[in-house]
């Protein structure tokens, strides 16, 4: 039995968002095809994720030295630890994001910062950093209004590229994508684009 974290980063649901519609189709099909697997939904817009600030950095330093943390430091450090441990407990991750300003919503970066921890998801060695998530799988579903997979705007895309890079850095050997794009560039194709993405999501769910 595998554990899947379904990690969404959109303020709207599948009735408004193409990425959320594809994500919903994926998860529903996945659960039908893998009834024994556990799926947990993490809505990053409804989840408290402390940013790495002065309290967190000071708290980590105090922990290393065996010193007492303030209440704020302890609260933030403990919450980040809980997020990390939940992430480590899973076998597969499904990220659902929109493209915002060539990347993704800031809550995704906050989440990535929470799970990118030396000694837990990667380690330092004489040969350089080494990823520790060598038995995990990732799927990224992202919706973009324009075309960024290829063409003149391809070099501007930094959301999926960053997520793929950080997951590779953390050692993840399997990274797949469902990219939904062009519905703003060609509004007359909106329904066709959405239907294709849902179909692709349902197909991938059977083998993921």
Swiss-Prot record:
Transmembrane segments: none annotated. Its cofactor is FMN. Coiled coil: none annotated. GO terms for molecular function: electron transfer activity; FMN binding; oxidoreductase activity, acting on NAD(P)H as acceptor; oxidoreductase activity, acting on NAD(P)H, quinone or similar compound as acceptor. The keyword Flavoprotein applies. Pfam families: Flavodoxin_2 (PF02525). It comes from the Bacteria. It catalyses: 2 a quinone + NADH + H(+) = 2 a 1,4-benzosemiquinone + NAD(+); N,N-dimethyl-1,4-phenylenediamine + anthranilate + 2 NAD(+) = 2-(4-dimethylaminophenyl)diazenylbenzoate + 2 NADH + 2 H(+). Keywords: Flavoprotein, FMN, NAD, Oxidoreductase. It is an enzyme of class 1 (oxidoreductase). The keyword Chaperone does not apply. Binds 1 FMN per subunit. Its EC number is 1.6.5.-, 1.7.1.17. FMN binds at residues 17-19, 99-102, 143-146. Quinone reductase that provides resistance to thiol-specific stress caused by electrophilic quinones. Homodimer. Belongs to the azoreductase type 1 family. This is FMN-dependent NADH:quinone oxidoreductase. It comes from Staphylococcus aureus (strain NCTC 8325 / PS 47). The lineage of its organism: Bacteria, Bacillati, Bacillota, Bacilli, Bacillales.
